[in-house]
Amino acid sequence: MTYLQESSRPAVTVPKLQAMRDAGEKIAMLTCYDASFSALLDRAGTDVLLIGDSLGNVLQGHTTTLPVSIDDIAYHTACVARAQPRALVVADLPFGTYGTPVDAFANAVKLMRAGAQMVKLEGGEWLADTIRFLVERSVPVCAHLGLTPQSVHAFGGFKVQGKTEAGAAQLLRDARAIEDAGAQLVVLEAVPTLVAAEVTHMLKIPTIGIGAGVDCSGQVLVLHDMLGVFPGKRPRFVKDFMQGQPNIQAAVEAYVSAVKDRSFPGPEHSF
């Protein structure tokens, strides 16, 4: 059995994501952790595969993402990459692996050697020097703003960010700082729709929303959430795309289509 792809679909690259954003084409991202789903999600037209530290929740059974190690992410990145997807492969730098620019680079190298084409890390202004350090060394970077799950204890739980005037202003400063530092993509999680729209309008790089409204350049969901197989409480921003579908590939195709035609997320999935 082989998971290698026989696809004529052009590869999705970092410049391709920028071109999609500039052309107004929505970007569909999903988390992915193994070769089988890498092949399936790629066939269904997913643009970006994220090896997220969410694997700590949906695969390992932890209540937070904090226990996930760099070796965990590297292992699952290699699994995803072996299917040779045409989608862009992005891997999370987990908690405690990017405290300094040097640490961030060393751990990013591990992930890129495993098959990642971009790394994602959580934080705003304070990460600008680290992002710049990575980009100068040919590591493409996706930043993550808003509800950053690695900060769950600092936030006092999983809470919407940017609801106050001060919070929204800080989010805008963070977004500007990470773009100026060279980030090529940014995830906005659990951010009010109007604030996310303002960030998206302000930035030149693509924004990927999760609970951040329909105006972002694209959307991302945790695979297990959108398939309705994770037993925990469903976040407001999740839609079960398996409902009414004959198989998983059809469900993923429905998700990709809904992102592309802006029918997802709806107001009921936003803040």
UniProtKB/Swiss-Prot annotation:
Belongs to the PanB family. Keywords: Cytoplasm, Magnesium, Metal-binding, Pantothenate biosynthesis, Transferase. Pfam families: Pantoate_transf. Binds 1 Mg(2+) ion per subunit. It is an enzyme of class 2 (transferase). Its cofactor is Mg(2+). InterPro entries: Pantoate_hydroxy_MeTrfase, Pyrv/PenolPyrv_kinase-like_dom, Pyrv_kinase-like_dom_sf. Catalyzes the reversible reaction in which hydroxymethyl group from 5,10-methylenetetrahydrofolate is transferred onto alpha-ketoisovalerate to form ketopantoate. Gene3D superfamilies: Phosphoenolpyruvate-binding domains (3.20.20.60). Its EC number is 2.1.2.11. Pathway: Cofactor biosynthesis; (R)-pantothenate biosynthesis; (R)-pantoate from 3-methyl-2-oxobutanoate: step 1/2. Homodecamer; pentamer of dimers. This is 3-methyl-2-oxobutanoate hydroxymethyltransferase 1. It catalyses: 3-methyl-2-oxobutanoate + (6R)-5,10-methylene-5,6,7,8-tetrahydrofolate + H2O = 2-dehydropantoate + (6S)-5,6,7,8-tetrahydrofolate. The active site is at 189 (proton acceptor). The keyword tRNA processing does not apply. One of its GO terms (cellular component) is cytoplasm.
